[in-house]
């Protein structure tokens, strides 16, 4: 008899346990799927049965209404009244989100056109764009338009202007001018005496 290592036996046990657990799990999933399918089929059959019953009920009331319309003269003369139930309206309900969807579609379209036409000065501003297509929108600007200033304009100022003042102007005053040192400096000392009367 061959003796296995304890770790080998433990590993085999783990593998067996995992495989059994996976098999059990798959079995449980299959069982749940079966139950869910059976429940869905049950509810679908019940719903179809109730729908067919309701259609027959409505058809019966429709026959009663037709009979009432055919015998309206008789009821007016005899005074008898027949109770009838009104058939619920089968008019399809209007989707309340349709205006919102249309508005969002219009906004996205305008934004797309503005982004597409940026730079060429053409945008579609009409409210009704049902007959508007992208084919009549220019996508490229004309390539022969002038884009820069003329290149033959003079760019430099004339360089022949005089930059220096004349150097032959007199810069010194004459040094032989009288300075006032030889003017008389003494005043007369024999001033006139004025006589006084007592």
From Swiss-Prot:
UniProt KW Signal keyword: yes
Induction / repression: Highly expressed in zoospores/cysts from S.parasitica and in the very early stages of infection on Oncorhynchus mykiss (rainbow trout) cells.
Motif (RxLR): 46-49
Chief place of localization: secreted
Domain of life from the UniProt record: Eukaryota
Signal peptide boundaries: 1-23
Subcellular location as annotated: Secreted; Host cell
UniProt keyword Transmembrane helix present: no
Composition bias type Low complexity, residue spans: 173-191
Annotated spans, Disordered: 48-101, 115-198
Biased composition regions of type Acidic residues, renumbered to the chain: 126-137
Skewed-composition ranges (Polar residues): 70-91
Glycan-carrying positions: 70
Gene Ontology CC terms, in alphabetical order: extracellular region; host cell
UniProt keyword list: Glycoprotein, Secreted, Signal, Virulence
Function statement: Effector involved in the disease saprolegniosis in salmonids and other freshwater fish, resulting in considerable economic losses in aquaculture. Within the host fish cells, Htp1 is involved in the uptake of the S.parasitica effector Htp3 at a neutral pH (pH 7.5) and its release from vesicles into host cytosol where it degrades nucleic acids.
Assigned protein family: Belongs to the RxLR effector family.
Comment, domains: Has a conserved RxLR motif that acts to carry the protein into the host cell cytoplasm. Lacks the 'so-called' EER motif, which is found closely behind the RxLR motif in most of RxLR effector family members, but the presence of an EER motif is not always essential for the translocation of every RxLR effector into host cells, or for inducing a hypersensitive response.
Quaternary organization: Interacts with the effector Htp3 within the host cells.
Entry protein name: RxLR effector protein Htp1
Lineage of origin: Eukaryota, Sar, Stramenopiles, Oomycota, Saprolegniales
Encoding gene (name): Htp1
């Amino acid at each position: 008899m061959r003796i296995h290592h304890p770790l080998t036996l433990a590993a085999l046990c783990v593998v067996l346990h995992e495989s059994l657990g996976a098999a059990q799990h798959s079995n449980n999933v299959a069982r749940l799927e079966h139950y869910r399918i059976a429940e869905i089929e049950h509810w679908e059959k019940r719903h179809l049965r109730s729908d067919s019953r309701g259609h027959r009920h409505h058809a019966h009331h429709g026959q009663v209404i037709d009979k009432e319309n055919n015998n309206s003269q008789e009821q007016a003369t005899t005074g008898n009244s027949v109770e009838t139930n009104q058939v619920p309206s089968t008019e399809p309900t209007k989707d309340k989100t349709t205006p919102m969807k249309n508005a969002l579609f219009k906004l996205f379209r305008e934004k797309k056109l503005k982004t597409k036409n940026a730079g060429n000065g053409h945008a579609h501003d009409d409210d009704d764009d049902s007959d508007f297509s992208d084919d009549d929108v220019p996508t490229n600007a004309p390539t022969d338009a002038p884009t820069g200033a003329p290149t033959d304009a003079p760019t430099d100022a004339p360089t022949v202007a005089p930059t220096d003042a004349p150097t032959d102007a007199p810069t010194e005053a004459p040094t032989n001018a009288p300075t006032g040192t030889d003017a008389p400096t003494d005043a007369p000392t024999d001033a006139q005496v004025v006589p006084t009367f007592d």
